[in-house]
Curated annotation (Swiss-Prot):
Transmembrane segments: none
InterPro entries in alphabetical order: Mito_gene_expr_regulator, Mss51-like_C, Znf_MYND
Keywords: Metal-binding, Zinc, Zinc-finger
Record-linked PROSITE patterns: ZF_MYND_1 (PS01360), ZF_MYND_2 (PS50865)
Keyword Metal-binding: yes
Mapped zinc finger ranges (MYND-type): 104-148
Cell inner membrane keyword on record: no
Protein name: Putative protein MSS51 homolog, mitochondrial
Binding site for Zn(2+) 1: 104, 107, 132, 136
Organism in which the protein naturally occurs: Mus musculus (Mouse)
Residues annotated to bind Zn(2+) 2: 123, 126, 144, 148
């Protein structure tokens, strides 16, 4: 993210909606009562909430004063919200968002299903799961005790993330003072940023924004070391994608110093990836390759946020700059319309963050033309997943498609921010881009 002096000015943040990010392993068949969302991982994720907690998706819409998912999607895409949508103050916003987590983690009952003598109370340790009575909490403890500590981090991060939305949390930036080849993981990255990082975090901890944030929640502010840790986790979550792209470029030794710059495609880009993205969010990729002559990062997917959509062909790439743009389409359609026609250059690298094609036949059907295209055109391709289980399932699919796997394993630049499975809070939290796979063309002939 660019320093404050370089960031474009933003209007007052729009009314915030809870962004529902469901790990792909939770996506399951769509209920017949709901319209088929197509190849949208965002829509599938939202609808699948009801599989674990019946009625949860409607509770979320109710708290936002919305009738259906179409209204929800309209607003997060920048459309005009219904007149009843919005929050009168920040305190109300946080309360409404917290209300969307209010269901019994054991019996799955929602607030409207409680008897008159019962009330949902949160776990006092993590403040992140709710129970309708002590019996449910006692019965759930064997499962919850395994994740309680991590879910406490999730609860803090969920609040602190608002500082990224408002722009109060500006990540440290600027050319790397160390040699790029010395930065191999988060430990070396944090060591390199050193005093600059500590100065940024300490200034934010003592800021008026931080004070008002916790005051609006109406609960005690955590200790400084807890908040410090949260800010560092959020930082890795923002920077994980650009640095993972850099990992891909390093793996296949792409010549980033070529005339005209390099083109990177992020395929299957979700709304979560592109909502509120800022021009400086990928600057760290440039610092990773100080000799680069320009990066054009194009995000392609059916859920790309409206603010990112623009005509990529009209942008001239200046040496040393990074340009972000988006196209709302399936990748193989985008390829036919933009690449085969010569409007845009062939990509040097293609990346898919959590494509989820292993989890749903519908998603696999949508991804198959893209995977075959990338294989047949021998485009270096990077894929990230949440877990070892997803890694193994995705590898098997790619092997069955006869792709040539050139690298895979734990991602040294995985996000360190734990992600709670929304409708199944006692499921082990996952971490974005925890593992990666790279393939290039077809498997060599035996």
């Amino acid at each position: 993210m660019a320093p404050r002096s370089r960031r474009r000015k933003h209007k007052k943040p729009p009314p915030v909606i809870p962004m529902i990010e469901i790990p792909p392993t939770e996506v399951s068949p769509v209920s017949p009562a709901l319209s088929k969302p197509g190849p949208s991982i965002d829509a599938l994720g939202f609808i699948s909430l009801d599989n674990n907690v019946p009625g949860l998706s409607q509770l979320i819409l109710q708290k936002l004063n919305m009738k259906n998912y179409e209204e929800y999607k309209l607003v997060i895409n920048g459309g005009t919200p219904v007149s009843s949508f919005g929050f009168r103050c920040q305190q109300e916003m946080f309360q409404k968002m917290e209300d969307t987590f209010r269901f019994c983690a054991y019996c799955k009952v929602l607030p409207h299903g409680l008897s008159n003598c019962k009330v949902l109370r949160h776990c006092k340790r993590c403040r992140n799961v709710y129970y309708c009575d002590t019996e449910c909490q006692r019965s759930d403890w064997p499962a919850h005790r395994k994740v309680c500590r991590e879910l406490r981090l999730v609860a803090v991060d969920r609040v602190m993330e608002w500082l990224l939305v408002t722009g109060d949390f500006v990540l440290p930036s600027g050319p790397w003072p160390w040699l790029p080849e010395d930065i191999q993981n988060w430990d070396t990255w944090f060591s390199m940023r050193g005093l600059q990082l500590e100065s940024t975090l300490n200034a934010l901890l003592g800021s008026h924004s931080m004070t008002m944030l916790w005051a609006s929640l109406g609960r005690p502010r955590p200790d400084p070391d807890v908040l410090h840790g949260s800010l560092k986790r959020l930082m890795t979550d923002v920077l994980s994608r650009p640095l993972t792209l850099g990992l891909g470029l390093r793996t296949v030794a792409i010549d980033v110093g070529k005339t005209g710059g390099s083109t990177l495609h992020v395929v299957g880009a979700s709304h979560v990836e592109t909502f509120l993205i800022r021009s400086g969010d990928y600057d760290e990729l440039g610092y990773m390759f100080p000799e680069h002559l320009g990066f054009h990062v194009i995000m392609v997917g059916v859920d790309v946020a409206t603010d990112l959509l623009q005509s990529s062909s009209s942008l001239s790439l200046e040496p040393g700059t990074i340009q972000l743009s988006g196209h709302r389409a399936l990748y193989h359609d985008f390829w036919e319309e933009q690449i085969e026609t010569g409007i845009l250059a062939h990509p040097d690298l293609v990346a898919a963050f959590h494509p989820g094609f292993h989890a749903s036949p519908g998603l696999m059907e949508a991804w198959l033309p893209t995977l075959l295209l990338l294989r047949d055109y021998e485009i270096p391709t990077l894929i990230t997943v949440y877990s070892q289980q997803e890694l193994e399932a995705s590898l098997q699919i790619l092997v069955n498609l006869d792709t040539h796997i050139i690298a895979c394993g734990a991602n040294p630049f995985a996000s360190l921010k734990p992600e709670q499975v929304y409708s199944n809070p006692n499921k082990q939290p996952v971490y974005s881009s925890a593992y990666y796979i790279m393939f290039l063309g077809s498997s060599p002939a035996n």
